[in-house]
């Protein structure tokens, strides 16, 4: 079992239940899924870029990503309908908790000029999104083999009813929010 999943079930559930004033342990918010998205607009010009992006996302997530394709043609961006322009992967279960562990303990502290995560990135329903400017913050990416620095979006979907519950859940997991 993943370290954070074990920690959540044995310690955080009871702590969050009292902290949030909930009656039933089934009301305690959990993390449902984590979605990683990497937009690769340059892939329209060069197909190799998409391969490198897919390899990076596979290494980070530990799971094969799905190629996202453009929905319509946009002349200004020089893309056509159906061209590959990104990649995404959805993590659930043990892989999700293992990724979250690596994100909190290794990747976030390695971000350059890091001063804490913004607490304003909640969507109103307890879900949190953050963007990373460099994929090299993750230990799975070998800096020497990277063709270019790419960012990625990370969306954490929770069962929280509001932002306060979501913030309490992520803070309990150890997310370094700005004070």
UniProtKB/Swiss-Prot annotation:
List, alphabetically, the GO terms of the cellular component aspect: ribonucleoprotein complex; ribosome
Q: Which InterPro entries match?
A: Ribosomal_uL5 (IPR002132), Ribosomal_uL5_bac-type (IPR020930), Ribosomal_uL5_C (IPR031309), Ribosomal_uL5_CS (IPR020929), Ribosomal_uL5_dom_sf (IPR022803), Ribosomal_uL5_N (IPR031310)
Lipid biosynthesis listed as a keyword? no
Q: Which UniProt keywords apply?
A: Ribonucleoprotein, Ribosomal protein, RNA-binding, rRNA-binding, tRNA-binding
Task: Determine if tRNA-binding is one of this entry's keywords.
Answer: yes
Q: Which GO terms describe its biological process?
A: translation
Q: What is the recorded function of this protein according to its Swiss-Prot or TrEMBL entry?
A: This is one of the proteins that bind and probably mediate the attachment of the 5S RNA into the large ribosomal subunit, where it forms part of the central protuberance. In the 70S ribosome it contacts protein S13 of the 30S subunit (bridge B1b), connecting the 2 subunits; this bridge is implicated in subunit movement. Contacts the P site tRNA; the 5S rRNA and some of its associated proteins might help stabilize positioning of ribosome-bound tRNAs.
Oligomeric state and interaction partners are given as:
Part of the 50S ribosomal subunit; part of the 5S rRNA/L5/L18/L25 subcomplex. Contacts the 5S rRNA and the P site tRNA. Forms a bridge to the 30S subunit in the 70S ribosome.
Which HAMAP family does the entry mention? Ribosomal_uL5_B
Its name, as the record gives it, is Large ribosomal subunit protein uL5
């Amino acid at each position: 079992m993943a370290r954070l999943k074990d920690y959540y079930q044995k310690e955080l559930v009871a702590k969050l239940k009292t902290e949030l004033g909930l009656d039933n342990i089934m009301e305690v918010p959990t993390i449902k899924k984590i979605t990683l998205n990497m937009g690769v607009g340059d892939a329209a010009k060069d197909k190799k870029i998409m391969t490198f992006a897919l390899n990076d996302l596979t290494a980070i997530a530990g799971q094969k990503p799905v190629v996202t394709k453009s929905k319509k043609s946009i002349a200004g961006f020089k893309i056509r309908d159906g061209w590959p322009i990104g990649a995404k992967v959805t993590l659930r279960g043990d892989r999700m908790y293992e990724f979250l562990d690596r994100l909190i303990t290794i990747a976030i502290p390695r971000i350059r000029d890091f001063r804490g995560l913004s607490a304003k990135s909640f969507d109103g329903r307890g879900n949190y999104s953050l963007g990373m400017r460099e994929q090299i913050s993750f230990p799975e990416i070998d800096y020497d083999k990277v063709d270019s620095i790419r960012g990625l979006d990370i969306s954490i979907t929770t069962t929280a009813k509001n932002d306060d519950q979501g913030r309490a859940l992520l803070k309990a997991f150890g997310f370094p929010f700005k004070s």
